[in-house]
């Protein structure tokens, strides 16, 4: 998973949904760390579609 910085509005929905705590707040966007298990929960809750598995 990765965050598309142009789309991310830093709402925090992804970070609060992540079951492994793999999403951390960065300076301009949220960052997906190595503890991501690719479950897709963050992608499903992102209101702007800023998270992609590609």
From Swiss-Prot:
- For this UniProt entry, which segments traverse the membrane? none
Q: Which residues bind [4Fe-4S] cluster 1?
A: 8, 11, 14, 46
Sites where the protein binds [4Fe-4S] cluster 2: 18, 36, 39, 42
A single cellular component GO annotation: cytoplasm
* Domain 4Fe-4S ferredoxin-type per the UniProt entry, residue ranges: 2-28, 29-54
- What does the record give as cofactor? [4Fe-4S] cluster
GO molecular function terms attached to this record:
4 iron, 4 sulfur cluster binding; electron transfer activity; metal ion binding
Instruction: Write the record's keywords in alphabetical order, separated by commas.
Output: 4Fe-4S, Electron transport, Iron, Iron-sulfur, Metal-binding, Repeat, Transport
Entry note: cofactor = Binds 2 [4Fe-4S] clusters.
Pfam families noted in UniProt: Fer4_9
Q: Entry's PANTHER family?
A: PHOTOSYSTEM I IRON-SULFUR CENTER, PHOTOSYSTEM I IRON-SULFUR CENTER-RELATED
Q: What biological function has been recorded for the protein in this entry? A: Ferredoxins are iron-sulfur proteins that transfer electrons in a wide variety of metabolic reactions.
Quote the protein name from its UniProt record: Ferredoxin
């Amino acid at each position: 998973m990765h965050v598309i910085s142009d789309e991310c509005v830093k709402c925090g929905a992804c970070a609060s949904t992540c079951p492994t705590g793999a999403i951390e707040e960065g300076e301009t966007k949220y960052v997906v760390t190595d503890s991501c298990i690719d479950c897709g929960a963050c992608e499903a809750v992102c209101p702007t579609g800023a998270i992609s598995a590609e």
